[in-house]
């Protein structure tokens, strides 16, 4: 099915299902139902089934899913078996934390470069062993290292300029942590992650719980 017909929330939930199934397989749970997946994740079983139905049949009604086969199937859909070379633009606290996060490598995302425009940071070596490159070298480095995904961790005022540079260098996917929307061509995918929005959403739910309305 064409990607544009699959709801973006479904794609995000697939990643959550994948992580859940990994844990279940480690616990030697060889079969699992949509109800069990839903209970583990706080998602309706009908939603789990609907999400999976976009990609064909994974299990049998009344029997459930083979955990390993479902994990492999979702992994193939998400491209997890592939290795994705990634770069980070902005060597501030957030950018450095992401670059040093070992979970990315385990998920198939390899940070091949970190860029910044601060002369004091350029040439520094991160805990992960990555050397911070001058942002001016970004086009050359991205092409040389076959990087396809870029992560933006710069101030909002610089985000669009960085996005334009990433696109010009051939980047096909961008994770934008800057608190502003960016514009890119239709052939480039963007995931906007505004941490403040997550906190506001959480605050709403906590507020409702405190009021006893939930």
From Swiss-Prot:
SMART domains referenced in this protein's UniProt entry, alphabetically: CoA_binding (SM00881)
Source taxon at top rank: Bacteria
Binding region for DNA: 16-55
UniProt keyword list: Cytoplasm, DNA-binding, NAD, Repressor, Transcription, Transcription regulation
Single GO molecular function: DNA-binding transcription factor activity
UniProt similarity note: Belongs to the transcriptional regulatory Rex family.
NCBIfam families, A to Z: PRK05472.1-3, PRK05472.2-2, PRK05472.2-3, PRK05472.2-4, PRK05472.2-5
Assembly description: Homodimer.
Protein name from the UniProt record: Redox-sensing transcriptional repressor Rex
Naturally occurring in which organism (per UniProt): Kosmotoga olearia (strain ATCC BAA-1733 / DSM 21960 / TBF 19.5.1)
Gene of this entry: rex
């Amino acid at each position: 099915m064409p990607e544009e017909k699959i709801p973006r929330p479904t794609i995000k939930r697939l990643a959550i299902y994948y992580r859940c199934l990994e844990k279940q397989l480690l616990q030697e749970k060889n079969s699992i139902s949509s109800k069990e997946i839903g209970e583990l994740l706080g998602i309706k079983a009908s939603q789990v089934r609907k999400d999976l139905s976009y990609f064909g049949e994974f299990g049998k009604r009344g029997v459930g899913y083979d955990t390993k086969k479902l994990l492999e199937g979702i992994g193939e859909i998400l491209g997890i078996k592939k290795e994705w070379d990634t770069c980070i633009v902005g060597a501030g606290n957030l950018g450095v934390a992401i670059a040093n996060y070992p979970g990315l490598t385990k998920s198939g995302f390899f940070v091949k470069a970190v860029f910044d425009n601060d002369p004091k940071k350029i040439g520094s070596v991160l805990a992960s062993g990555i050397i911070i490159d001058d942002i001016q070298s970004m086009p050359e480095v991205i092409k040389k290292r076959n990087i396809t995904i870029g992560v933006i961790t710069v101030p909002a005022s610089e985000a669009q300029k960085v996005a334009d540079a990433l696109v010009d260098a051939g980047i096909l996917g961008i994770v934008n942590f800057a608190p502003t929307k960016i514009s890119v061509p239709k052939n480039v995918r963007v995931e906007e992650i505004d941490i403040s929005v997550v906190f506001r959403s959480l605050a709403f739910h906590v507020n409702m719980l405190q009021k006893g309305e939930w």
